[in-house]
């Protein structure tokens, strides 16, 4: 086959983009970005379901559109929101617009976007503490390390451990790589006795079986594709259960904000007065 100079240049550019090296940020304490934009006066004693949302906002490029999507009916009023492929500015803009507190710990500087890249946790409730969790293995293409953003969110007096995750891509690592990354998250969560949420882009559907084996509910198992034909964006919980028959779904209208579709689930605590219930020091 004869290649034109343009075609050859295009192929070379794509190859270089795929192999560009990320700058990993492996210091556990940072960089760290937090913000407090949640409205005061929320009733911490109100009884109600807990809405969880996760959305991979592709490279944090179209933040205004992402905000509009997150204001849609099934996503509006999320108690726990995880965002993937975020940078610090995009995370702050979404938090300001939706009146949320947030914790954001980038795991790398993206090799082609040249900005921070990682998952974020946001909530209208108080984030008691947060940290970066380093995940094992380096991408075989971009040599990028993955991280999870972890936070403890006090929802109506119940402390919930939340992990915003974005596992390695199929091009960057094998199923075993993603399994090892999940096991690292599970080991970190094991020390916490209250409810746990693990949500984000897992770059795999079958990985859900591993989380189920370790006692997690796979809330979005039957929600449907979240990117093209693949069902990679998922929500798993421990110590929480579906709030009703229509507890989970995928929002199809994304307004061009991303190539991913946001996913949601609605839950309640498994047991009234479950571990993790604390007296809130104030209303938020």
What function would you assign to each model-found segment?
Residues 58, 87, 126, 166-168, ...:
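Catalytic metal-binding/acid-base residues of hydrolase active sites
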Residues 47-59, 131, 159-169:
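Active-site-proximal beta-strand elements of phosphoester/diester hydrolases
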Residues 25-39, 82-159, 247-254:
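Structured beta-strand-rich core segments of catalytic domains in phosphoester-bond hydrolases
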Residues 150-163, 174-213:
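His/acidic metal-ligating clusters that form di-metal
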Residues 6, 16-97, 109-113, 179, ...:
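N-terminal, active-site-proximal structural segment of metallo-dependent hydrolase catalytic domains
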Residues 1-9:
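Bacterial N-terminal signal peptides that target proteins for export
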């Amino acid at each position: 086959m004869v290649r034109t100079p343009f075609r050859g240049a295009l192929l070379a550019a794509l190859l270089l983009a795929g192999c560009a090296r990320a700058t990993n940020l492996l210091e556990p304490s940072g960089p760290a970005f937090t913000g407090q934009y949640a409205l005061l006066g929320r009733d911490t004693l109100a009884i109600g379901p807990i809405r969880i949302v996760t959305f991979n906002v592709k490279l944090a490029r179209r933040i205004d559109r992402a905000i509009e999507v997150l204001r849609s009916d099934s996503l509006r009023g999320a108690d726990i929101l995880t965002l993937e492929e975020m940078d610090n500015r995009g995370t702050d803009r979404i938090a300001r617009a939706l009146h949320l507190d947030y914790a954001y710990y980038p795991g790398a500087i993206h090799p082609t976007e040249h900005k921070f890249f990682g998952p974020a946790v946001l909530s209208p409730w108080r984030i008691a503490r947060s940290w970066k969790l380093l995940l094992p293995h380096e991408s075989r293409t971009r040599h990028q390390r993955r991280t999870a953003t972890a936070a403890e969110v006090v929802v109506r007096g119940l402390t919930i451990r939340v992990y915003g995750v974005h596992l390695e891509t199929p091009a960057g690592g094998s199923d075993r790589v993603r399994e090892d990354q999940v096991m690292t998250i599970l080991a970190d969560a094991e020390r916490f006795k209250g409810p746990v949420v693990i949500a984000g882009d897992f770059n795999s559907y079958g990985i859900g079986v591993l989380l189920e084996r370790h006692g997690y509910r796979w809330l979005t198992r039957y929600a449907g594709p979240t990117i093209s034909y693949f069902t990679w964006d998922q929500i798993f919980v421990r110590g929480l259960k579906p709030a009703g028959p229509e507890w989970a779904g995928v929002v199809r209208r994304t307004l061009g904000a991303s190539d991913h579709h946001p996913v949601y689930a609605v839950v309640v605590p498994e047991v009234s007065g479950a571990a993790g219930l604390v007296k809130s020091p104030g209303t938020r």
